[in-house]
Each structure stands twice: as C-alpha cells, then as structure tokens.
Swiss-Prot record:
Example of a GO biological process term: proteolysis involved in protein catabolic process
Native source organism of the sequence: Serratia proteamaculans (strain 568)
Listed GO CC annotations: HslUV protease complex
Family named by the database record: Belongs to the ClpX chaperone family. HslU subfamily.
Source organism, top-level taxon: Bacteria
Residues given in the record as ATP binding sites: I18, G60, V61, G62, K63, T64, E65, D256, E322, R394
GO MF annotation: an example: peptidase activity
Keyword terms, alphabetized: ATP-binding, Chaperone, Cytoplasm, Nucleotide-binding, Stress response
Gene name per UniProt: hslU
Protein name (Swiss-Prot/TrEMBL): ATP-dependent protease ATPase subunit HslU
Coiled coil: none
Role: ATPase subunit of a proteasome-like degradation complex; this subunit has chaperone activity. The binding of ATP and its subsequent hydrolysis by HslU are essential for unfolding of protein substrates subsequently hydrolyzed by HslV. HslU recognizes the N-terminal part of its protein substrates and unfolds these before they are guided to HslV for hydrolysis.
Length: 444
C-alpha cells in the first residue's frame, strides 16, 4: 500500500495530467485516508468507511487518465470498469458482482508477484544448484540416489564461479521444466464466466504438474528455473488470504461512464436492465456486502469506489438517490482551454511532441517544435473542439497526426534532415481544414 502524502501524490499526477487540481486533491486525500485508517486501532478502523468520489466533467479532460495513474501509485488492488458493460441480475450480460471477482483476481496476481520478488534470492540459489546438478551430477550411493549433505567438490565450485561470472551463458544444457498446464478453451454465454473459470481450473488440475525436458542455453534456462523455483516457494493458501485481505482493506474500484446508466428525465418507464437496474445492483457493493469468489468470500465494506462520467445529457441527480448518497465527494473537472492544450503538448512526461520527436528520430529525422508552432496547434485543436464536438485533449492526437502525416510518410527518404514545425508550417497544413467546418468534422 502506498505511503505517499497527498502533496506527493498530486505532484506525481502533475507529471502526467495538466490542471484539474480539485480532482487530483480529492483522489490524493482518499488514497492517503486508506493509509491513515490502517494506523487506527481495530475497533475504530472497522467504523471508518471510505468516502467514495464522483468525478464530473466533459470527455477528454483527464478523468480516465487520473484513474490510470492512480492505479500505478496506489500499490493496492485496483480495477477500472465501464458501467455500460453490466446488466441487471437475471438478464444476459455481466453482473456487477464480477467487478469484485476481477478485483480479487488482480489482487492474487499482485500478491503473487510480490511474493515471488521476496523469494527471488532463494529461488536464484535453487536454480543455480539445479544447473550445477546438470553440469556436474552429484555423487550417487549404492541405490542410485544422490547423496545428501556432501561437501561441494572443487570442480563444482569452479563451475559455480564461472556460472556467476556469465562465462557459461551460451552453453546449451538439457533440463526438466514444468510443462505448461493443459489449456481448455470453454465458450460460455455472458454472465457464466465464473463457472467457466472453475471448469478450466478443474481441467488444469487433472493434468497434474508434469516435467518436460528442454534444451536451452544456460542464460535462458536460469531465468525459467528462477521463475519455477520462486513459484514453488509461494504458499497458495497464504496467497489467497493475503489477497483477500488486500482487497477488503485497500481495494479501489474505478467505475467509468456512470452517466450512461442514468435514467434521463422524461424517458418512458419500463424495464431498463442496463441502467437503473445496474445502479440498484451496484448499491450493495458500494454500501458493503459479501461477494463469493473462487478464492473465498470478500467483504466490500471498505473498498473505495471512484465513479466518473461526462454527464452531458444527464445530471448526477438522475442517479438513484441511494447511489447518490453513497458518492458523497463530488469533484467537477473543467473543460480544457488553449493554454491547457499548450501545456499538455510540452509539460507532461513523454508529452505528445516528445513522442513524435523520438519516433522520427528512429529514422534519423530531427524534429523541432517552436513555441509559436505549439501555440498554433493548441489553437487549432481548441477551435475544432468548439466548432464540432468537444472531445477534450483527445483532439490533439487527431490534429498532430494530421500535421505529421507527410513527415511520417517520407521519413525514411529524408534521413538526416531537420524539420522545424513553426506557426507557418501549422497554418499551411491545418488552417484550411480548421476553417472548413464540414471538413474538420470528418477529418479532424
């Protein structure tokens, strides 16, 4: 679990997301409160429930990007889902309980990787011994079994030294590795994924853990043996317990496009299996219930839920009242301005302009963006957003791709040249498209 302070979290998010300080502060405080809660005594800890967040803002302003970056910072089980993928219980489609099952699977994977990393040193020692056993087989007793507790021979020690120094990396050896589990592809109707997973697990267990001889270079064999030995050192039962504990205490669920499951005012009544029904199914998860997964029972009382939506044709008040009450923290994200677009093009780590420079650099073409050129690109993107559909920062991808089309096409033939993208270059390539609303609607 991350121990970063709210200021550190916001600073890290600033490296990738421009503006939207209110949203960054809200998620930073929520993430820090997870850590604060774990410092309380057990009785009080149980009473402190997470304050779920609803992020409201037009498309392309950074809602999903905040979720992506938060997942990397959280160091906790995290899953992002689209609200539109689910249907009410009893109808064809995914049920909302699958959110918690997927979150638990993510936690199992995360805890397994942590456990493997923790055991890596021991796994490397065991892998080294297995390779040395192939290079210099240990002495055997009268029954043909390897003798235990024998002193390492001088030859074995010499080979160990060579192995550690990489002198034997290219030597080929034959080793026994665990065969890949038997893969059984089962096609199941939507909503039956849990049954499919259980059947696949059953077939894999029936296959048993078979050893398969393989001829590999020592360098490759060592990597595979380390993974195999590290996996053996992981206790499956402990793994499940730790993963379920991590989900219950630190899990974070990000629900995108929640506005798409609102019942908009004035709509006719009747069955609405992918809207209000989904909201009612989400309620127990958000307020706290117990979900059955293949790894065990998971309580959702202390899982943090962050929902987001553009709310262009609906409003947060169109959510059912019970769900509104379970999302107490509201954060509005602002539409992006020309100045924001300018900053997006230059300030974030691996900004769009840096990406294009690096891509063209692989062909030996040197690209330079001037400040005036970047300003004109930002103005063009903002203008198209205003005159057609506002898709936020995603418009920059379209505009830049159009601007760089000729250079990208000719790059292999203009090796060694330098190209400066200034205001005149941008005007020559974009102004006609931007000015013609019909063209910009279809091309930009």
């Amino acid at each position: 679990m991350s121990e970063m302070t709210p200021r550190e979290i916001v600073s890290e998010l600033d490296s990738y997301i421009i503006g939207q300080n209110k949203a960054k502060r809200a998620v930073a405080i929520a993430l820090r409160n997870r850590w604060r809660r774990m410092q309380l005594n057990e009785m009080l800890r149980h009473e402190v429930t997470p304050k779920n967040i609803l992020m409201i803002g037009p498309t392309g302003v950074g809602k999903t990007e905040i979720a992506r970056r938060l997942a990397k910072l959280a160091n906790a089980p995290f899953i992002k889902v689209e609200a539109t993928k689910f249907t009410e219980v009893g109808y064809v489609g995914k049920e909302v309980d699958s959110i918690i099952r997927d979150l638990t699977d993510a936690a199992i994977k995360m805890v397994r990787l942590q456990s493997i990393d923790k055991n890596r040193t021991r796994a490397e020692e065991l892998a080294e011994e297995r390779i040395l056993d192939v290079l210099i087989p240990p002495a055997k007793n009268n029954w043909g079994q390897a003798e235990e507790h024998q002193e390492p021979s001088s030859a074995r020690q010499a080979f160990r030294k060579k192995l550690r120094e990489g002198q034997l990396d290219d030597k080929e050896i034959e080793i026994d590795l665990a065969a890949a589990p038997m893969g059984v592809e089962i096609m199941a109707p939507p909503g039956m994924e849990e049954m499919t997973n259980q059947l696949q697990s059953m077939f894999q267990n029936l296959g048993g853990q078979k050893q398969k001889p393989r001829k590999l270079k020592i360098k490759e064999a060592f990597k595979l043996l380390v993974e195999e030995e590290a996996a053996k050192l992981v206790n499956p039962e402990e793994l499940k317990e730790q993963a379920i504990e991590a989900v219950e205490q630190h899990g974070i669920v990000f629900i995108d496009e929640i506005d798409k499951i609102c019942k908009r005012g004035g709509q006719s009544s009747g069955p609405d299996v992918s809207r209000e029904g989904v909201q009612r199914d989400l309620l127990p998860l958000v307020e706290g219930c117990t979900v059955s997964t293949k790894h065990g029972m998971v309580k959702t009382d202390h899982i943090l839920f962050i929902a987001s939506g553009a709310f262009q044709t609906a409003s947060p008040s169109d959510l059912i009242p019970e769900l509104q009450g379970r999302l107490p923290i509201r954060v509005e994200l602002q539409a992006l301005t020309t100045e924001d677009f300018e900053r997006i093009l230059t300030e974030p780590s691996a900004s769009l302009t840096e990406q294009y420079k690096a891509l063209m650099g692989t062909e030996g073409v040197n690209i330079e963006f001037t400040a005036e050129g970047i300003r004109r690109i930002a103005e063009a993107a903002w203008q198209v957003n205003e005159s057609t559909e506002n898709i936020g920062a995603r418009r920059l991808h379209t505009v830049l791709e159009r601007l760089m089309e000729d250079i990208s096409y000719d790059a292999s033939e203009i090796n060694g040249q330098s190209i400066t993208i200034d205001a005149d270059y941008v005007r020559n390539h974009l102004d006609e498209l931007v000015a013609d609303e019909d063209l910009s609607r279809f091309i930009l």
